[in-house]
Amino acid sequence: MAYEIYIGDRMFSSWSLRGWLMLEKFSLPHKVQLVGLYSGTMAQEMAHLAPARLVPALRTPEGTVVGESLAIAETLAEQNPDAGLWPADPAQRAAARWLAAERVAGFSALRSECPMQLAHIYEGFETSGAVQADLDRIETLFAGACGVVC
């Protein structure tokens, strides 16, 4: 049996992209259910799955529904321990979880001022101080992570 992942358009929704990408990257069998993220139908389409009516939402082969990227990651890791979703080493795994949590909850200026739109080329964008601070933090996190997680 396969997982079902409920997402919006991966070109415009980083939340949707994250949910789908975990399944793709680790070759876990899945079926994509696209919901109307921008058509106004998402809340109705998601009502039977998730009280928050947000994407992504995952239905496991057993029928359990899980929302939120990190909860989905944890569920997939538990159900597929050999897939390598998290590092095997406890210290590396803790660092990876920290990075993932900060990615989900942090960088508000970057998300606010730089919406995800993979089909558009932005020219002449001037980085605000807040966005630059987020970018600097990302560089610091990933530079440090390669000594711990990579």
Label each PLM-derived region with a short phrase.
Residues 1-128:
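GST-like domain detector, emphasizing the conserved glutathione-binding G-site
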Residues 107-111, 144-149:
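Short, structured loop/turn "capping" segments at alpha-beta junctions
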Residues 126-146:
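Amphipathic alpha-helical packing segments from all-alpha helical-bundle domains
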